[in-house]
């Protein structure tokens, strides 16, 4: 039944596109890629020299990834140098859309963290592959790569396979993050000029709620004055940690209302959150970070966080799960296989858990990028989505942030009524809820948590395609 409906979605989209460490680091910190492996992993492929010297065809040919057994997806991978002084390099893995790649939008995916590898998004959420416990590669039923050309980048420098040779090569602000990503994108579209004419979207989840607006703002600012213009059409952010102040201020009440805190625990949590917000207002960034870390994450705190102690759970990504699903970490072992490393051109380069990235971005953890998001909402298509079951950036906390934003549609947004969203008219199940004002779409997806495409792959697939291809939110005929 599900496959039949999936075929219906695909057929509709075929017609549609035919011509005419921080706060959210725990899930990534638990994914450890061993640096010990046997066999020939090949050599890292650095593509910037090919780009600089105009050897485009050779660079494309060298970056092509050998297909995995049973798979036939075309893809390209390698390193782009974004700072020669510090030898800072960003790793990318690019999948042209299976369907009409010559016209399909190019979608950049950025994982959160800070320090979470976008390989998590590729293997766990919406890439073409799923890794099983015995290291078998199987095809995903609802890959975003079916209709979209997906560009996965390990970001910032020092995340996953991305690396730098100097401590000054690490980002310490969102400006640094955006600058490195912009450099990578300009080089990427030079290496793959056939995709430079296509619409471009910046997407991500969680802490990427900072990266995405930062990069979009950077592109928006530079496009008018640069010869090469990136065809930015919009952004999409899942469970967006964009404005920490408004989110943190709502934690205690939300956790109490869903039964994870009792009355006394709520009072303590609220007191600490209020203190954290006070420090944010005073720009005492490290003091605010330390309070938040002790309350929620426990990355630099000795022992468990307050949240972990009182709930008994390490997983704050889905209210129905107390620990992280084991299958979310299978890809880590896969990335140690020498034949895989050789195929994606990383050689014996270490895979970082992002701890050093988080260290350099600690002050950034509690800073807001709300002005940049407001700017983007004034000019481009924007999708902000939440999983109904998320805890750490819950739908209610996102709405708390959105209600506090000032953009040209803010008044209309506050008055707008949300509508029920179903994928098919015959569905008994509701996929979620949508509130739309102009080019802005806010979506809550039922039955999913923070790692939404993992929990609800079909609904996520439908959502991203409705948004990017402007299909609206009316249900399809069965």
Curated annotation (Swiss-Prot):
Coiled coil ranges: none
Annotated keywords: Carboxypeptidase, Glycoprotein, Hydrolase, Protease, Signal, Zymogen
Family: Belongs to the peptidase S10 family.
Keyword Oxidoreductase part of the UniProt annotation: no
Protein name: Probable serine carboxypeptidase CPVL
Top EC category: hydrolase
Keyword Nucleus: no
Enzyme nomenclature, EC number: 3.4.16.-
Transmembrane segments: none
GO biological process: proteolysis
Lineage of the species this protein comes from: Eukaryota, Metazoa, Chordata, Craniata, Vertebrata
Catalytic machinery residues: 206, 390, 450
Species per Swiss-Prot/TrEMBL record: Mus musculus (Mouse)
Glycosylated residues, chain numbering: 83, 134, 309, 350
InterPro entries: AB_hydrolase_fold, Peptidase_S10, Ser_caboxypep_ser_AS
Any GO molecular function: serine-type carboxypeptidase activity
PROSITE patterns: CARBOXYPEPT_SER_SER (PS00131)
Signal peptide: 1-22
Gene3D superfamilies: alpha/beta hydrolase
Role description: May be involved in the digestion of phagocytosed particles in the lysosome, participation in an inflammatory protease cascade, and trimming of peptides for antigen presentation.
Domain of life: Eukaryota
